[in-house]
């Protein structure tokens, strides 16, 4: 999967928009971060230049199991490691599994929205 395929997949979910939220920070890595939002809440982000991993929300009960099963899934850098995981591309995590995890992340965020926010999607 390349950055355009990944981006297209993330944008395929209802109510999703993208933004590069750190255009003025000093370090280039942060400036190149593309975030995917639903109702202004992040569910996924990725560096568009390096495209080595994505960081996504994850059910805390599943996080440890996933990290045990795949070497390409690690605690979410630089986020709260209880609720976020980093999923590395081109390692042992199949593209279909990455898509499943991104979809789960989207669902976690949607479930956290208010009823009014969900109705506006």
Q: Predicted segment positions?
A:
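Charge-dense, helix-prone N-terminal extensions
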Residues: 1-121
């Amino acid at each position: 999967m390349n950055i355009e395929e990944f981006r297209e997949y993330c944008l395929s979910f209802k109510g999703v928009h993208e933004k590069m939220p750190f255009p003025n920070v000093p370090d280039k890595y942060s400036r190149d971060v593309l975030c995917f939002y639903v109702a202004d809440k992040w569910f996924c982000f990725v560096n568009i230049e390096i495209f080595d991993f994505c960081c996504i929300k994850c059910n805390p009960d599943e996080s440890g199991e996933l990290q045990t099963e795949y070497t390409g899934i690690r605690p979410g850098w630089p986020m709260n490691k209880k609720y976020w995981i980093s999923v590395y591309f081109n390692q042992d995590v199949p593209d279909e599994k990455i898509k499943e995890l991104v979809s789960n992340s989207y669902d976690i965020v949607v479930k956290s929205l208010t009823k009014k926010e969900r109705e506006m999607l």
